Structure formats: C-alpha cells, structure tokens
Amino acid sequence: MKLTCMMIVAVLFLTAWTFVTADDSRNGLDYLFPKARHEMNPKASRDIKRCRPGGMICGFPKPGPYCCSGWCFVVCL
C-alpha cells in the first residue's frame, strides 16, 4: 500500500515537473523553427533550393519535404 501511494505521488510529481519546466505548453517543434527563421541569412537562404523536382536523385525511399512531390524512391517521384 505504501509503495503504491509512493509511486502515485512520484508519477504526479514528475508529470507536474514536466509541465512546469516545459518551454511552451503547445507543441514546441511546430513553433521552434518559425522563431529561428528571422536569424537566418536571407542572402544565403535564396541560394538554397527548398525541394528537388521530379526525376532528380534523392537517395533512399522516404516521404518528406526533400522532394517537391514529397515522395522519394531513389529519384523524386
């Protein structure tokens, strides 16, 4: 009984600690990158292509923003 109560208190404490020490109560990854965007060099960012067009080699099969279509299977689809 004592062990159960101690475990419940520990879980509640750790949960509260996580919420108190969090930087942002919203999903932090969604808001992390837009905050840092103003620190980027605008001239350097113009030279970087955002995505690869269809037919370009992309490396390995994965969905994501690497290809403009969002799909890669050796070449961008």
UniProtKB/Swiss-Prot annotation:
UniProt subcellular location: Secreted
Superkingdom per UniProt: Eukaryota
Proregion positions: 23-48
Tissues with expression: Expressed by the venom duct.
Keywords: Cleavage on pair of basic residues, Disulfide bond, Knottin, Neurotoxin, Secreted, Signal, Toxin
GO molecular function, one term: ion channel inhibitor activity
Record text about domains: The presence of a 'disulfide through disulfide knot' structurally defines this protein as a knottin.
Entry protein name: Conotoxin VnMKLT1-012
Source species taxonomy: Eukaryota, Metazoa, Spiralia, Lophotrochozoa, Mollusca
